[in-house]
A protein has these predicted regions:
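Hydrophobic (often cysteine-bearing) scaffold residues that line and stabilize catalytic clefts
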Residues: 12, 16, 75, 79, ...
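Active-site-adjacent bridging/hinge elements
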Residues: 1, 133-140, 212-219
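Metal-dependent nuclease catalytic regions and adjoining charged, substrate-binding loops involved
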Residues: 39-43, 73, 152-155, 164-272
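Residue-level signal for well-ordered alpha-helical scaffold segments within enzymatic catalytic domains
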Residues: 22, 26, 81, 85, ...
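Nuclease catalytic cores
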Residues: 1-32, 107, 239-242
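Non-catalytic protein-protein interaction segments used by genome-maintenance enzymes to assemble
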Residues: 102-164, 168
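A non-catalytic, helix-rich entry segment at domain boundaries
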Residues: 23-106
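Short, solvent-exposed segments of well-ordered alpha helices
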Residues: 7, 11-14, 150-154, 231
């Protein structure tokens, strides 16, 4: 990240997630603007079909993918199905999007300082009211089976704590935690499970205190211009894209980087 290296090929899971989130954000906004369920869904599916028609052919058509590769589940047909089924599953969603003078609280960019030299930034999918209580809603898509093993990874979790803090600080909304809306993409079906991650004020205080220690450690690495490997994290979340580079001798890593990656500096402060 510091040097701006990114893979030359497409990140299938990232692209699928961007398309899925974008479609649901658009659906939420259309519903707020007065479109009926069917009108909003028709518009979203049409726009998604257009967005996934690239260079004269469908993006990741199922017939073009190796069915033995689990990533083949992240295909155009399954994307469309998952959008439609999610919208139908939550047609009468008890989690209602909160609305402010600026409109519906969906796809919210946040940026706030935590001291004089550090800022936290990112995006929230949605802020909702559920049973008269405010929550952040985070939508996930996965090929994993949805059960306790899957949802346990989000509590405790850095992202869930950050989203809770961001809602409370940047949007002055004292949320109780995060609702995780997960979509399982499988052969022939998409399945949805809703789970809750609750955060108490004491937990948030602890997370902020711990964050200060991690940032202090990062300062030390900057001063030494050396970032040690954390090789216990190399295989998490589908595996780090740099595993193949880090497994090489330090003396030859640059050559492998240049052949498989390209430099593309990312500025998280730029609103997408």
């Amino acid at each position: 990240m510091l040097e701006g290296w990114v893979g030359r090929g497409e990140s299938v899971h990232l692209e699928f997630g961007i398309l899925y989130h974008g479609a649901l954000e658009r659906f939420d906004r259309l519903r707020y603007d007065g479109a009926s369920h069917d009108e909003a869904l028709y518009t979203v599916i049409r726009e998604t079909l257009i967005a996934t028609w690239r260079e004269g052919r469908p993006w990741r058509a199922a017939k073009d993918l190796n069915p033995d590769d689990k990533a083949s589940l992240k295909c155009r047909e399954n994307l469309i199905r998952t959008i439609v089924w999610y919208a139908d599953k939550f047609r009468n969603d008890p989690a209602a999007t909160k609305v402010t003078a600026d409109g519906p609280m969906v796809e919210l960019h946040f940026l706030f300082e935590i001291d004089k030299i550090y800022s936290l930034c990112g995006y929230l999918d949605r802020i909702v009211t559920f049973q008269d209580q405010p929550f952040v809603m985070d939508r996930k898509s996965t090929t994993s089976t949805l059960g306790s093993y899957y949802f346990d990874q989000y509590d405790p979790d850095n992202q869930m704590s950050l989203y809770t803090v961001a809602s409370q600080v940047a949007f002055k909304t004292p949320v109780k935690g995060v609702i995780v809306d997960a979509a399982q993409i499988a052969v022939g079906f998409s399945r949805f499970v809703r789970s809750f991650v609750f955060k108490t004020p004491d937990q948030i205080d602890e997370w902020m205190r711990d964050l200060g220690y991690w940032l202090h450690q990062a300062e030390y690495f900057v001063e030494k211009n050396y970032w040690p490997q954390n090789d216990k994290s190399c295989h998490k979340y589908g595996g780090c894209v740099f595993r193949g580079i880090c497994s090489k001798s330090p003396s030859v890593r640059d050559k492998f980087l240049e052949s498989s990656f390209e430099r593309r500096l990312w500025n998280p402060l730029i609103i997408r």
